[in-house]
């Protein structure tokens, strides 16, 4: 038998809120600024100015979207973004280039390109070839450092290495691992390199002045087995004269990457620091060979804090690495220790409290609360 109408009305009013109540509560707090379209007179829509084209409407919509508003967007409510102006820039100052000079160079290049008959004919016949090396060099010289900075922020390198401080890698750092006699595995900015490919020290090149000094650091951000806030130093070269890496002081010998099995991808970073003068790195010196992980415990932030008066971060390159068979050899032969193996243990599935009378539930409902693994389905 259906419930009387007066009972439904009585209990319905007690459990829900009407439109009038919601409207009244919303009026209790006035808006913090003008509401959208508040300045439009809706009483006479025929007199309003029309856009007459979609392009005008699009420009107006983009202008309104870029304008500051008093209300918060969905991203501002749920994503807490730090202001880039609040971050400390610890890198080198940007090179000063006149904008007028840039425009003149672009005009001169376009003029030469338009006057080149062979290039025009090759483009028309679809046989033109693009010099990728020149394109990459131009990218490294213009917007490349900013792209590298954005990638490093995306992977959390600045957050974990320098506690939020940032820098623009103005000096292009080229790192490549030799595989075989002719093949090279380059290190870009987030690509994957296996531990087998990185078993030997890489070839590092960069452009530098004749009388300058540099420091090269190679670390693992995610591989420490005991301290979550520490890193392992795999290679440290100090007081490098100009770009002659082989003549630098090997403060810490090279150790191949050893990401533990089951720990996923690890971030390995090459940091290039520019020195203002020769620095004494006796506190950071490790014995050679160094196969004790306790001696390779490292903190980049403390290292930079000790020598920040005499060196500045200038270059960056990093890759991702995960376990392969060569890691077992590194643990057993070089580090002389048992290999740690990690496994993700999933939490047990949650089941609500069992009902005595599971109304409209399938027969498999009882399998959730049985002690044995024998299924109920198919027995009866």
Curated annotation (Swiss-Prot):
It is found in: Mitochondrion. Gene3D superfamilies: PEBP-like (3.90.280.10). The keyword Mitochondrion applies. Pfam families: PBP (PF01161). Residues 1-26 form a transit peptide. Residues 100-123 form a coiled coil. Keywords: Coiled coil, Mitochondrion, Ribonucleoprotein, Ribosomal protein, Transit peptide. It comes from the Eukaryota. One of its GO terms (cellular component) is cytosol. The keyword GTP-binding does not apply. GO terms for biological process: mitochondrial translation. Belongs to the phosphatidylethanolamine-binding protein family. Mitochondrion-specific ribosomal protein mL38 subfamily. Component of the mitochondrial ribosome large subunit (39S) which comprises a 16S rRNA and about 50 distinct proteins. This is Large ribosomal subunit protein mL38. It comes from Mus musculus. The gene is Mrpl38.
